[in-house]
């Protein structure tokens, strides 16, 4: 069985292999939408509409204009929600290709007119940036380097719009082998679990939000 990895899938597995297996592979359970996830989806859609079509932000999101307006005004080749995939040999492929190994969808991607520099951004609607994970930007940078060979530098940002914080990170093409090696190692842990058929649960404070009701650590058991 070939697996298509992503930042969120890797994080799910590392958080709890049992949950990853039940939800993502066996598909016995589905993660339920919450007020927070629905809000995040609405913000993402509003930002995309503003950047691509100039649609005004809804009044509820008006205070976020300070984040999205500079993105829309950048003099560059701007793409929103561009689906990218790479194969296990680190070559580019389509998001839905049969041999896709890693997938990524940056919320925002802008490639400079020279083609040398790219900017990626991911919108966050959480109430704190304390545990911001720039690894997401790192993986997106790798995707950009592979899909856009002229790009030699990627400037990334996690935009925590609710709390008004921006977490930045920057990557160069020289770092690409190291980045790919790191993510290959993280993916190997999932592939190893698949090979041996062992998906141990990992108890944490997040168990109360988990949809896997059959697990011994589920809050209802």
Describe the role of every protein-language-model region.
Residues 2-15, 96-111, 174-181:
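An acidic intrinsically disordered interaction segment
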Residues 2-56, 81-82:
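Nuclease catalytic cores
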Residues 1-2, 18-30, 116-121, 186-194:
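Short amphipathic alpha-helical segments and their helix-coil junctions
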Residues 24-26, 35-37, 59-62, 76-83, ...:
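Short coil/turn segments at secondary-structure boundaries
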Residues 4-5, 86-92, 98, 129-132, ...:
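Metal-dependent nuclease catalytic regions and adjoining charged, substrate-binding loops involved
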Residues 42, 135-143:
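Short amphipathic alpha-helical face segments that pack within enzyme cores
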């Amino acid at each position: 069985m070939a697996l298509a990895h992503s930042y969120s899938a890797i994080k799910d597995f590392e958080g709890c292999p049992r949950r990853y297996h039940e939800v993502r592979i066996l598909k016995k359970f589905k993660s339920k939408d919450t007020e927070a996830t629905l809000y995040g989806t609405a913000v993402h859609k509003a930002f995309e509409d503003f950047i691509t079509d100039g649609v005004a932000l809804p009044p509820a999101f008006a205070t976020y204009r300070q984040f999205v307006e500079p993105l829309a005004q950048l003099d560059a080749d701007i793409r929103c929600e561009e689906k990218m995939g790479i194969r296990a040999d680190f070559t580019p492929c389509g998001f839905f290709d049969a041999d896709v190994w890693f997938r990524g969808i940056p919320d925002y991607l802008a490639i400079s007119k020279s083609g040398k520099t790219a900017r990626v951004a991911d919108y966050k609607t959480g109430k704190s940036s304390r545990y911001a994970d720039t690894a997401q930007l790192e993986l997106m940078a790798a995707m950009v380097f592979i899909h856009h060979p002229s790009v030699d530098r990627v400037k990334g940002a996690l935009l925590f719009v609710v709390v008004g914080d921006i977490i930045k990170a920057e990557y160069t093409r020289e770092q690409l082998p190291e980045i790919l090696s790191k993510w290959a190692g993280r993916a190997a842990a999932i592939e190893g679990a698949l090979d041996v058929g062992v998906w141990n649960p990992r108890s944490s404070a997040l168990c109360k939000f988990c949809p896997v009701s059959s697990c011994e650590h589920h809050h209802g058991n």
